[in-house]
Amino acid sequence: MPSSEVKAGVPSKPEGTQTTHYSVVDADGNAVANTYTLNTGYGSKFAIPGTGVLLNNEMDDFAVAPGKPNVFGLVQGEANKIEPGKRMLSSMTPTIISKDGELRAILGSPGGPTITTTVAQLTRALIDYGVPLDQALPAFRAHHQWLPDAIFTENIIPADIEAELEKRGHKLMKRPRIGHANSIEVDPATRGFRAVADTSRAAGKAAAY
């Protein structure tokens, strides 16, 4: 094939630029929920010489300027200002759920400040409403972070919910996706595992062996 006919391919799913989450469980029920991040695209834009490993810019999760928004629009105060010996306030929420000592689920997500609401909504769907994670993950999500005073919603928000929120005076700000959860659910009756990747929002995969 002539070089002039070689074209760039079209990715089937957009690749995430920062945070990654994975959930793992073995045959004995030993579980790991791991969320790690560069924070923003290419992190600090500095690589460890000779390794190609990028360093993150998690310093932005501190209130670099208390009272002013960070890169995600979060406005924080003096309690989260940069000081020696402190760990910055992070939204990363790797989660393992158990009941009576038995593993029930493993989940987490990228998404900056939307991570906590993504994990909370999935946990409530599973625990409070008994919705399996393979049904809960594709459902629409919403997020509020105090400032701006608006509810971020996904474009797939049902029309009746959108109308009801607007009727109550909420300002809605739509975005293509919120979060990108990856999870494993344990059937409480059979103790079997169900791995679910949030493939409706971005690239991801559930695998078992």
Give the ranges of each region predicted by the language model.
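Glycine-rich phosphate/pyrophosphate-binding beta-alpha loops
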Residues: 23, 35-47, 94, 109-116
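Active/binding-pocket-proximal capping segment
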Residues: 38-62, 68-71, 113, 122-126, ...
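Glycine-rich, flexible loop/turn motifs
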Residues: 38, 42, 51, 78, ...
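Internal maturation/activation junctions in enzymes
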Residues: 1-38, 47-51, 58-59, 65-69, ...
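Catalytic core segments in nucleotide and nucleic-acid processing enzymes
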Residues: 119
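C-terminal catalytic domains of large/alpha subunits in multi-subunit enzymes
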Residues: 1-16, 26-28, 61, 81-91, ...
